[in-house]
Curated annotation (Swiss-Prot):
Top-level taxon of the source organism: Bacteria
Family stated for the protein in its record: Belongs to the YqgF nuclease family.
A family per Pfam: RuvX
Protein species of origin: Synechococcus sp. (strain ATCC 27144 / PCC 6301 / SAUG 1402/1) (Anacystis nidulans)
Protein name as it appears in the record: Putative pre-16S rRNA nuclease
Primary site of residence: cytoplasm
Any one Gene Ontology BP term: rRNA 5'-end processing
Xref: SUPFAM superfamilies: Ribonuclease H-like
Length: 149
């Protein structure tokens, strides 16, 4: 399976966590946290990272509701992602990000750090989890139904 230089984005109201992976899809790391100001600033910050890393794909966490529906935050994320894709001329794909921020916070606590002191660390870790989930999904064998007759 070919991999791409991809960025994982955890888009929130105040911050955007950014993660990257190598072209082989082996390693994922949190890169930075962008403090949101306005759309143009968000695009400029993400564009600089995308150009530096020669990104070909944006993997965006979509915060589905626990019942699987798209709530207001998910719809805002989709609107932002569509505009970002157009501005950067990069394709996007979505990953179900339910509970990634919670999981990221638990991981930070597990190493003895205080998540409340560095919210940006949670955003970066959540972005890394989003990107890792996408990479894992690319590795899964596709099942197109039964081969038995």
């Amino acid at each position: 399976m070919p991999y791409y230089a991809a960025l994982g984005l955890d888009v929130g109201r105040r911050r955007i966590g950014v993660a990257g992976c190598d072209r082989l899809g082996i390693t994922v790391q949190g890169l930075t946290t962008i403090v949101r100001r306005d759309f143009a600033s968000d695009v400029a910050a993400i564009s600089a990272i995308a150009k530096e890393r020669q990104v070909e794909l944006l993997v965006i966490g979509l915060p589905y509701s626990m019942d699987g529906s798209l709530g207001s935050q998910a719809k805002q994320t989709q609107r932002f992602a569509t505009r970002l894709s157009k501005a950067l001329q990069l394709p996007i794909t979505y990953v179900d990000e339910r509970l990634t921020s919670f999981e990221a916070e638990e991981m930070i606590k597990a190493v003895g750090r205080s998540p409340s002191r560095d919210k940006g660390a949670i955003d970066r870790k959540a972005a890394a989890l989003i990107l890792q989930q996408w990479l894992d999904e690319q590795r899964e064998p596709r099942r197109f139904g039964s081969t038995q007759h």
